[in-house]
Amino acid sequence: MSSSSLSPTAGRTSGSDGDSAADTHRREKRRLSNRESARRSRLRKQQHLDELVQEVARLQADNARVAARARDIASQYTRVEQENTVLRARAAELGDRLRSVNEVLRLVEEFSGVAMDIQEEMPADDPLLRPWQLPYPAAAMPMGAPHMLHY
């Protein structure tokens, strides 16, 4: 194949200036269309980049809020754990005092013959001592009850 056979004007006569002007006009029109298309494409890319930058800023702000909240919760957890440790020690101390008082009351009851109302210790497995635990095992929803879930 020769290079002249690949030319878009191959097979045309060189005397047809009307076709050449039309080809030039089409090429110029296509060039302008391509420029406009490229400009719109750059504009879309810039808008997308701006949106991504805004999203990054929003996500960083959200991340900072979540991190601050996590720090607050961690400090509250530490404070509550310390308070629980103090309360457990106090409960153990009060339990010891109750046992001592009960022993004294039993001795008084034994030697005086007067019946005493002796408060016995609360059992160690008392659910009131475990407020965050259920006093009974959590039962799963029966599989045969899907009719109960109406939205």
Swiss-Prot record:
Q: Where is this region: Disordered?
A: 1-47
One of the GO biological process terms: positive regulation of DNA-templated transcription
> What do the Gene Ontology cellular component annotations say?
nucleus
Bias (Basic and acidic residues) occurs at 22-39
CDD domains tied to this protein: bZIP_plant_GBF1
| Entry superkingdom | Eukaryota
Protein name per Swiss-Prot or TrEMBL: Ocs element-binding factor 1
* Lineage start: Eukaryota, Viridiplantae, Streptophyta, Embryophyta, Tracheophyta
